[in-house]
């Protein structure tokens, strides 16, 4: 769970309803991004696939449109796009709120909470006692394939006093358990974040219930990590193939509260080795470790228990860094569109690369395509297209000194502009005139990411547009910028232009996206 003082949260409800398929124009509701029908959600929790069903849990206030009364909301999907709301999975009760955590399958029933014929699914979460403001680690389990969850009677499984020797606040700042089974050592591993202490701690267990501290990963032990990156929260950890090498590496993903490229919180990932007790980080490169250069991609986690036949590492985050400030009245926040995370060499550097899940193609329809066409200064293409839910793909060869601009959600006085500036190889999102930016000092501005042409001089940009968001993927997905926007309904135009030189458009595909 993110620190209540860190304003980067969103919302969702826990009712068994169907996700609205069209934006509610009076409240900026997105068309194809996950949101609840009312109230508050922060980051996703316990992402897991059970059979053919994807489970999404999330931090949720079921009674108000602000942070508080935090439980685990729950929704399910068979395609990661059409979601059905389910009842609250882990409730806020007896003065203990259910903060962030993760889920995992216990196939050998090492926890003893199921049986050999029906092994349990387990969920670990931070218990936050409101009266004392203390945090401890707790366990819940499901023996009906994730439909309902029961809190372990022996909670907490790691008490504040057990955390205290490893936490300078005496255990008050230990949270967000990431738990997985480490087949190499035969132990269960828990990774805990220690907020303002800028460290993670690693614990082991043979039975998922009794835990022993093993080591800490501190900022000072990571070569190249800036001391300005503070407030570590929401850890994830997994092995990831390095494409083209036949090798894998361990990855730790987390959300610092400060120090991101766009200012404030953001998600970074580092590679390293893990021996079952200690994670040793590789030296980091500040230009490649951030997964998103926008303002609105926070608290990312990945789905687990995904079959090897699928093979994808799919992540999602909450899109909101402004607490309760965004100008929505019945909800706060939304889930980023699910994206794959890979690790590969791009040019001379190893990069984390991300792309929207391919399932998006099944709910989109091409509106206009262009191919092998030169665009020159003074021309405007795509101006006949209107839409607030789009998937726009542009691949082009820019002239030296040129700037290619894709303008989305364009109106009489509003627009969000995605630029590629050839001279400094920079991808940017300009929210200066994107609509309502009065709600927060950080709501406007320009966010940038480095994006080099490929070996042939080609630049590729993909933009997911929804009612109140843009997610921009550059190149193979090595440059990503995700931002909230709040334009008027009538600002639904599109434009493709170039200045400072020509650009040869290899391909353009504008697709309309609909869950119907």
UniProtKB/Swiss-Prot annotation:
Gene designation per UniProt: inuB
GO cellular component, as recorded: cytoplasm; extracellular region
GO BP term (any one): sucrose catabolic process
Catalytic reactions on record: Endohydrolysis of (2->1)-beta-D-fructosidic linkages in inulin
Pfam families from the UniProt entry: Glyco_hydro_32C, Glyco_hydro_32N
Domain of life: Eukaryota
CDD domains: GH32_Inu-like
Top enzyme class: hydrolase
Locations listed in the record: Secreted
Family assignment from sequence similarity: Belongs to the glycosyl hydrolase 32 family.
Residues of the active site: 43
Protein name, UniProt field: Extracellular endo-inulinase inuB
